Amino acid sequence: MTLTNQMDFQNHFLAKDLHRITKPKKVGKRRHTDESNDEDASKPRFMPKTLSKLAQHKKQRQPQVMGQKLSVSRIIETLDQESLQNLISNLVSEHPEVAPTLLKISPQVTIEDSLMVLEQKLERILQNMPYRVDASSDYSFLRVKPHVEDFFQTLSDYTLNFLPPIESDLTVPLMFLMKFLAKCFPRLPKFHAVEYRYYHSLTVDKFNTILDDILVQFLSEKKHNIILAINQDWLTDFRKISELNDNNFSSVYERLKQEIDQYENPDAASGQPSTNNAGRLTGLANLLNFSSDNSPLHGNTVGNVFDTI
């Protein structure tokens, strides 16, 4: 091979090597990695203190809305009648000293309110009566005995509340008893149990005393009161009341009839002696007591129970 041919052969392979693709060296990447390591090393390390500041920052960004309990007025507005009644009862039990204040600021109980409560308690008696059993049997009475006792105790409380000197308007006790005896009292079951018959007989006896006394006081209080009784036809009302209650209040009817006859015929009744009813209700608060402690089965009643039945 000549010298010229050798040079051409070398140039051929040299040109071929120039077009060969070779892998890049990792010198630059290594240099970049080293620089990154140096940069990370120069940075401060992550400390727990920074995390605490971050948590504190997040906490400060939360809305500052705190919960609170309902006010007393809102609670009272929300409660139903039974819940409110239990609340006041518990309050008086825990703090008896608030009872006088409660009585002082409480609204006056009306006749309609009292009759509504008594009718509700009567409905409880009737709704709890056993089925397919004689309504007058002792078993029926025992089933509703707590409701019966509650009814008579409530009746006693309302009646005494409407009597003088608590109530100065004599028409209030008259209207209360007349409406009660016409609408509520006749609907009571006629139990044969001795305890119930005692309660019932005691009620009839004391209501006769109350009505007779209050009626005479009312008619003698003002001259035009007898005209009011005539115009409102009280005589018919008392006659119906007596008929609805097995004629147990016929004496009150006769008393009113006598007063009206005396007013309409003063000459015919001038020779009849007047009855003095002053002080007839003295001690009635002790006698008109339907508490379960005064039950004939407890032996705490005045006199012989069977004398009043």
Curated annotation (Swiss-Prot):
Compartments it resides in: Cytoplasm; Nucleus
Positions in coiled-coil regions: none
Gene3D superfamilies to which the protein is assigned, alphabetical: Tethering factor for nuclear proteasome Cut8/Sts1
GO biological process, alphabetically ordered: nuclear protein quality control by the ubiquitin-proteasome system; proteasome localization; protein transport
Keywords, in A-Z order: Cytoplasm, Nucleus, Protein transport, Transport
Biased composition (Basic residues): 21-31
Keyword Methyltransferase: no
Compositional bias annotation for Basic and acidic residues: 32-43
Pfam families: Cut8
InterPro entries cross-referenced by the UniProt entry: Cut8/Sts1_fam (IPR013868), Cut8/Sts1_sf (IPR038422)
Molecular functions per Gene Ontology: proteasome binding
One Gene Ontology term, aspect cellular component: nuclear membrane
Protein family according to the UniProt entry: Belongs to the cut8/STS1 family.
Subunit organization: Binds the proteasome.
Protein name: Tethering factor for nuclear proteasome STS1
